[in-house]
């Protein structure tokens, strides 16, 4: 009788342990399922390209504002893409080439002193400026940038722009001009002296004769 009682107790104890283990297993499974449901899913940030476009657009607008501060610039546009920053300016059609180059130089100097425009390229060719404006619109509309980037690189390689990093400082230009003027005056004086010497020589020779 005592042995039977012990067997019954052992059976109850084992059943209770098995029940407790099963309950714990269910709790662990439920907790794991709950964590999976609440755990954030990491996916590719599809807005990154939009953010990049926004940044490029903001910089382009800033470069346009810098260029348009020049009173001789009627309108401006800019495209910032990849490693390129190209600024196109509209000027008076009646201006001669030298005046246009002077305006380009002035705009390039302004961009050189700007943190976003130090490597910008300035162009004033009407057709190219018009195309730049179209490219800017295409970028803002979300068109693929690969083809635009290739075309932008071709524009930079085709035109002869003012590159602000390579522009000579304003302080150097007057000095160079002054040196050239001094050299020209010196050469002129030497030529006049030589002519006077030759004239004196001929006069003395004629007197001796």
UniProtKB/Swiss-Prot annotation:
Gene Ontology terms: biological process: sporulation resulting in formation of a cellular spore
Biased amino acid composition, Basic and acidic residues: 28-54, 183-209
Alphabetically ordered keywords of this record: Germination, Lipoprotein, Membrane, Palmitate, Signal
Signal peptide span: 1-16
InterPro entries: Spore_lipoprot_YhcN/YlaJ (IPR014247), Spore_lipoprot_YhcN/YlaJ-like (IPR019076)
Superkingdom in the source lineage: Bacteria
Cellular component, GO, one term: membrane
Intracellular or extracellular location(s): Forespore inner membrane
Lipidation (N-palmitoyl cysteine): 17
Membrane topology: Lipid-anchor
Entry function: Probably contributes, directly or indirectly, to early events in germination.
UniProt protein name: Probable spore germination lipoprotein YlaJ
Organism encoding this protein: Bacillus subtilis (strain 168)
Gene, per the UniProt record: ylaJ
């Amino acid at each position: 009788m005592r042995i039977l009682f012990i067997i019954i107790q052992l059976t109850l104890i084992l059943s209770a342990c098995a029940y407790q283990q099963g309950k714990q297993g269910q709790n662990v499974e439920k907790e794991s399922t709950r964590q999976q449901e609440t755990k954030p899913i990491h996916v590719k940030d599809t807005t990154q390209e939009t953010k990049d476009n926004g940044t490029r657009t903001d910089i382009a607008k800033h470069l346009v504002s810098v260029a348009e501060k020049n009173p001789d610039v009627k309108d401006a546009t800019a495209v910032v893409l990849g490693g390129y920053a190209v600024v196109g300016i509209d000027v008076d059609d009646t201006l001669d080439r030298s005046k246009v180059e002077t305006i380009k130089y002035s705009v390039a100097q302004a961009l050189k002193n700007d943190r976003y425009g130090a490597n910008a390229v300035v162009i004033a060719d009407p057709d190219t400026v018009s195309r730049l404006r179209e490219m800017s619109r295409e970028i803002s509309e979300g068109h693929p940038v690969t083809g635009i980037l290739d075309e932008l690189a071709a524009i930079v390689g085709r035109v002869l722009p003012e590159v602000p990093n390579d522009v000579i400082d304003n302080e150097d230009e007057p000095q160079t001009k002054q040196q050239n003027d001094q050299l020209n005056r010196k050469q002129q004086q030497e030529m006049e002296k030589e002519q006077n010497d030759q004239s004196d020589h001929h006069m003395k020779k004629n007197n001796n004769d």
